[in-house]
Each structure stands twice: as C-alpha cells, then as structure tokens.
Amino acid sequence: GVPVCGETCFGGTCNTPGCSCDPWPVCSRN
C-alpha cells in the first residue's frame, strides 16, 4: 500500500513535510 502520513487533507494541503495530498483526502509520502 501507499505509505500514509497519518494526516487527512480535505482542504487540499498536508502539514507534514514530504507528504502530498494524493490520493485525496489522505496525505501520502511523495
């Protein structure tokens, strides 16, 4: 599976460094 960052991003942004909002609405390592 995709490594997640323990964060959701319904607003479209992730606060965790090195993470992107993909697939929405879950932050994953980019």
UniProtKB/Swiss-Prot annotation:
Q: Which Pfam families does its entry note? A: Cyclotide (PF03784)
Where does the signal peptide begin and end?
none
A single BP term in Gene Ontology:
defense response
Q: Where is this cross-link: Cyclopeptide (Gly-Asn)?
A: 1-30
As for PTM, the annotation reads: This is a cyclic peptide.
Lineage, top-rank taxon, reads Eukaryota
Identify the keywords attached in UniProt to this record, alphabetized.
Answer: Disulfide bond, Knottin, Plant defense
Q: Which cysteines are joined by disulfide bonds?
A: 5-19, 9-21, 14-27
| UniProt family annotation | Belongs to the cyclotide family. Moebius subfamily.
Could you give the domain comment from the record?
A: The presence of a 'disulfide through disulfide knot' structurally defines this protein as a knottin.
**What is this protein's function?**
Probably participates in a plant defense mechanism.
Q: This protein is called what?
A: Varv peptide G
Upper classification of the source organism reads:
Eukaryota, Viridiplantae, Streptophyta, Embryophyta, Tracheophyta
